[in-house]
Amino acid sequence: MKHLQMKYNSIQFLYWITNCTIFGYVAIFLQYKGLTNTEIGIVTAMGSIMMLLLSANISNLPNQFEKLTPHNVILGIYVILFASFSALYFITLPKVIVMVLYIALLFLSTCVVPFLSQFAMDYVKMGADINFGLARGLGSFSYASSAFLMGYLVEWLEPSVIYIVFIVSSILFII
């Protein structure tokens, strides 16, 4: 049972680092990519609107399709996140494409949260004693500490380091 708690703690810890790279540094990364403050505001607003409109549908996918598991949905989301962030990092794109890709990053990354809660409920159904509060607390700590450390990394290096932190934390999350 302790193994499941450690696994769940790690999932929460790493997810919130990934979330910090996308949400916590949205303005810095998008300014680095040439967007204005107004355009960044549009991106964040549209990301929130898309989340409101689509997150319930995405979190319901495993209920609609028998062979689709929450884990598979998360993997699919992360494939899109990898592709979107990689395109933003490696390719010089028109502003509108940068905006669309970052909107996808924002709303898709939030679609993972219901699945993280579902994992805890599934573990409890299996008879495991999962301390959800501890795991979420570690997630909050990881968000705060990664935000703090990335601030220094961005200052010492450049905003593209945000992508590298995203890739590393995402790969560890998926494993």
Locate the predicted segments by residue.
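Symmetry-related core transmembrane helices of the 12-TM Major Facilitator Superfamily/SLC fold
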Residues: 161-175
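Structural signature of the two symmetry-related core transmembrane helices
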Residues: 71-87, 167
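Hydrophobic core of transmembrane alpha-helices in multi-pass small-molecule transporters
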Residues: 13, 84-85, 95-115, 119
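Small-residue (Gly/Pro/Ala) motifs that create kinks and tight helix-helix packing interfaces
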Residues: 27, 58, 145-154
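Helix-loop boundary and gating motifs at the non-cytosolic
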Residues: 1-52
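Paired intracellular helix-loop junctions of major facilitator superfamily
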Residues: 120-131
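Helix-to-loop junctions at the C-terminal end of transmembrane segments
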Residues: 53-69, 154-155
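Glycine-rich segments within core transmembrane alpha-helices of 12-TM secondary carriers
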Residues: 50-52, 130-150
